[in-house]
Amino acid sequence: MKFVINTSIACWLLAWPCFAQSPESDTLRIQQLRTVEVRTSRPGEVHSLPDQQGTYLMAGRRTELIRLADTDADVAQKNPRQLLARVPGVFIYDMDGSGNQINVATRGLDAHRSWEMNMRYNGVLTNSDMYGYPASHFSPPGESLERIEMVRGTASLQYGAQFGGMLNMVSKQADTTRRFSFESIASIGSYGLRSTYNAVGGRVGKLTYYGYAYWRHADGYRQNSQSDAQALFASLRYQASSRLSISAELARSTYVYHIPGPLTDSMFRADPRQATRTRNYFSPDIWVPSVRADWQLSNQTRLQLITSAVLGVRNSVLIDAFATVPDVPDAVTGQYRQRQVDSDHFNSFTTEARLLHQFQLAGMATTAVVGGQLMHNDLHRQQLGKGTTGSDYDMTLTAPFGRDLWYYTRNGAFFAEMQLKVTPRLTLSPGIRFEHGLTRMRGVITNYDPGNLPNDIRHQFVLLGISGQYRVNEALRLYGGISQAYRPVIFKDIIPASTYEQVDKNLRDANGYNAELGVEGRWKGVHVNMSLFDVLYRNRMGTLVQTGTDGQPYTFRTTIGDSRSQGVEVLLEGQVLNAGRLTVSGFTSTAFMDARYINANVSAGTENRNVTGNQVESAPRFTSRNGLTFRYRTASLTAQYSYVGMTYSDALNTPVVTANGAKGPVPAYGVWDLNATWRVTPWLHVRGSVNNLLNSQYFTKRPLFYPGPGVWSSDGRNAVLSVGIKL
């Protein structure tokens, strides 16, 4: 990275006393000094968040801070295995085509739209509906990101109760030294990729502004997998005084993805790029407005208030069937079948208040954070509508929705955490969170007895946690902690899949804990962060076979048991060679995990089967990402190899692939990537990537629901070139 420092003024001020004391001349000769250019670079290391990050307390936890400018990652396609390469154990699910949404999870959790995580953008919650559909459909462009912050679940009492922790994507900010600045990044790539990102920002008096507009098109690796994306962002911050700032932000992301459909294993082996659908589409359109106040009440006290919303819609129109069911015109009429139309309407409002205060307690330096969170969510779900027989993205109905439901949630939470400096080296952080809320489901399902629908679900938890940290010295720390967590019963859990399915009226929210114990240190340019973890997840949802009063079997949706994930996460990175202008650094980010069901039973045909000891689906035992980075002056080149072990698609651990591809093992895979960056001048940079260099054919998951059971091919070899300017 280059830093350009104009030293003219500094040299003039230093020289002034000498001129002033000269008796030989009362005139000054003015000489224009040359600009001095200082060039340096920061290694692409992952850093832990500081013990206090704004109004968050982070001591004693495993955290990661990734600055995108320090990496060579493919930002244009927001490639998560590169962006999060140095976060060990991250499971990545390829679903919506490159460049759209990031689907990630850690420690044996489900990666579907990152819904086990507390997802944020600039600290603002972006999960679509935390109690109805916690998936994050909001998808900011990679070009807009300055850094990514990840916090594991042991800190969840402060921001939510999610098992997966928090992932906060932080946007670039305005250059406050200028009234106006401009940035533009244009990208082209394989399979019709074209994108442009344009941003402006600056400061005028007490007002700081920043905004961007983004557009991207890609034809996609597979047939019928085009996507078109747009994003907008605007931010205004008013510095009312040296202690008070008020800001407002408005973010929007939307895209339309042409869904190519699932494959069977034989189809995948024959041609992983083929499609089984030509008329399936998915499109979220999400707005995230927010208002924030940061008030430094005193040198010891800080107050932060954020009011935000997630507003928008998630639409899909598709033929929902196995890969073995072709979507072809009727032999008699020549018409296609009518497509299924589904639509979720999100109206999620959140207010969060956080008060941080520093004081002495029994002679110990103490930092305390107390706060509250209020959620007011209305989710309107419309499903099983009959659409057109056409082939375009068209949400027109020809018959009413088969499901027309509302999911109302009112929830309040209070939390408190203290960071106690027991000794100059030892820190303890106990915390508590209290959740109290009610979710009400109303509406109709065609041909289903309303009396069989659960109506009200209460959420009431007291969650406890404690973390500790011991700094052996400035370069070495020991950390660990345990925190309780829970996941509310969501809309999907309580809606019967068919008239032959019933839902437990006494469903219980999932609950459990996150525990970790680790060591982090730096020694002679080597950075090591190694942690052990243990995640207990009670009340997992599933189905059992029951017998009705008429003697007929039926499917019963309920909690089917628990699971436990244990393992080790290791990050090792450091400089391998320093030969003046040429440096070579490397890293390995590796995790071993054993995630298994305990005390669990699931339905298998017409019987229930005990799955205690079976592996949790989509939880690889071994994940490793490794890379070497070569830096010469202002250019860098990174070669990365990613390996993900074999996983199962279902709790039964079905050993043999089914004919329709819906169940069976997901084979292990390895992928090579090559990325480069050249910072030509302080205002011009070029990035290039060759993803999946050896053209490996692989897939990451066999989904059991959306976008359809079966094999979903990940992208083969592809390249992208980006050029960026800053003025």
Protein language model features and the residues they cover:
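Extracytoplasmic beta-strand/coil segments of soluble accessory domains associated
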Residues: 53-57, 65-66, 75, 81-128
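Short acidic/polar hinge/loop motifs at secondary-structure boundaries
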Residues: 124-152
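Transmembrane beta-barrel wall of Gram-negative outer-membrane proteins
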Residues: 188-217, 222-258, 280-301, 433
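Structural signature of Gram-negative outer-membrane beta-barrels, strongest in the C-terminal barrel
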Residues: 241, 346, 363-367, 373-375, ...
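Face-selective signature of the C-terminal outer-membrane beta-barrel domain
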Residues: 242-246, 251, 285-319, 331-444, ...
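Membrane-embedded beta-barrel scaffold of Gram-negative outer-membrane proteins
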Residues: 294-320, 471, 477-483, 508-573, ...
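Gram-negative outer-membrane beta-barrel transporters
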Residues: 424, 532-536, 554-653, 694
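C-terminal beta-signal and adjacent terminal beta-strands/loops
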Residues: 486, 538, 584, 642-653, ...
